[in-house]
């Protein structure tokens, strides 16, 4: 397992706001895991480990929660952050089966300076995200679209996107335009 995705956790049997304050006082984050038709699990994670490994995370960031006995494949469903200190004080994780493909929307990240724009064309972005299908651990956080070769008057279609090998397009119409340069 890719170590950068693994997050150590400990299960907890006591919960509530006073218990959550005690957990935070120990520089830990109270959290819950739900999904897969299982009961909600309450746990705690070290805030230093979470902040170090996942300083920036998206809806598509896959984590592996490891309590020493069981590894659970999860997404961050919600993270409550203190506005003043910018510290995360509670996390909701959503568990998925790592062996079952899922469909998720992934942002399209535009890179490069288009030839068409350099010639005075106007770039119009029609889709900012694309629906893809993959196993959870293969899910990209974004899809890059290199605009460098796109000329004035050209467009890029969904089917033109370069996807990682284990990721497939899950959109109904692969001929939809992503960007146009007029």
Curated annotation (Swiss-Prot):
Which CDD domains is this protein grouped with? Ribosomal_L25_TL5_CTC
User: GO CC terms on record?
Assistant: cytosolic large ribosomal subunit
Q: Give disulfide pairs as residue numbers.
A: none
The cross-references to Gene3D superfamilies, in alphabetical order and at most eight, read:
Ribosomal protein L25, beta domain, Ribosomal Protein L25, Chain P
Against Pfam families, the record matches this protein to: Ribosomal_L25p, Ribosomal_TL5_C
One of this protein's GO BP terms? translation
**GO MF annotation terms:** 5S rRNA binding; structural constituent of ribosome
Q: Which UniProt keywords apply?
A: Ribonucleoprotein, Ribosomal protein, RNA-binding, rRNA-binding
Q: Where is the signal peptide?
A: none
The keyword Ribonucleoprotein appears for this protein:
yes
Alphabetized PANTHER family for the sequence:
RIBOSOMAL PROTEIN L25/GLN-TRNA SYNTHETASE, ANTI-CODON-BINDING DOMAIN-CONTAINING PROTEIN, RIBOSOMAL PROTEIN L25_GLN-TRNA SYNTHETASE, ANTI-CODON-BINDING DOMAIN-CONTAINING PROTEIN
Function recorded in the entry: This is one of the proteins that binds to the 5S RNA in the ribosome where it forms part of the central protuberance.
Q: Which family does it belong to?
A: Belongs to the bacterial ribosomal protein bL25 family. CTC subfamily.
Q: How does it assemble?
A: Part of the 50S ribosomal subunit; part of the 5S rRNA/L5/L18/L25 subcomplex. Contacts the 5S rRNA. Binds to the 5S rRNA independently of L5 and L18.
- Per its record, how is this protein called by name? Large ribosomal subunit protein bL25
The organism encoding this protein is Borreliella burgdorferi (strain ATCC 35210 / DSM 4680 / CIP 102532 / B31) (Borrelia burgdorferi)
Whichever gene encodes this chain, its name is rplY
């Amino acid at each position: 397992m890719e170590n950068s995705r693994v997050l150590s956790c400990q299960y907890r049997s006591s919960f509530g706001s006073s218990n959550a304050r005690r957990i935070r006082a120990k520089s830990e984050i109270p959290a819950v895991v739900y999904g897969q038709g299982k009961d909600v699990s309450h746990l705690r994670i070290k805030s230093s480990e979470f902040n170090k490994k996942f300083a920036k995370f998206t809806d598509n960031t896959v984590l592996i929660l490891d309590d020493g006995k069981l590894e659970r494949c999860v997404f961050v469903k919600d993270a409550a952050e203190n506005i003043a200190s910018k510290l995360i004080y509670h996390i909701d994780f959503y568990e998925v089966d790592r062996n079952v493909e899922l469909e998720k929307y992934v942002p399209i990240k535009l890179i490069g300076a288009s030839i068409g724009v350099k010639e005075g064309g106007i770039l119009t972005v029609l889709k900012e995200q694309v629906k893809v299908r993959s196993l959870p651990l293969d899910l990209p956080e974004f899809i890059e679209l290199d605009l460098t070769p796109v000329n004035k008057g050209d467009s890029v279609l969904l089917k033109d996107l370069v996807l990682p090998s284990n990721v497939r397009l899950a959109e109904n119409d692969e001929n939809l335009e992503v960007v146009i340069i007029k």
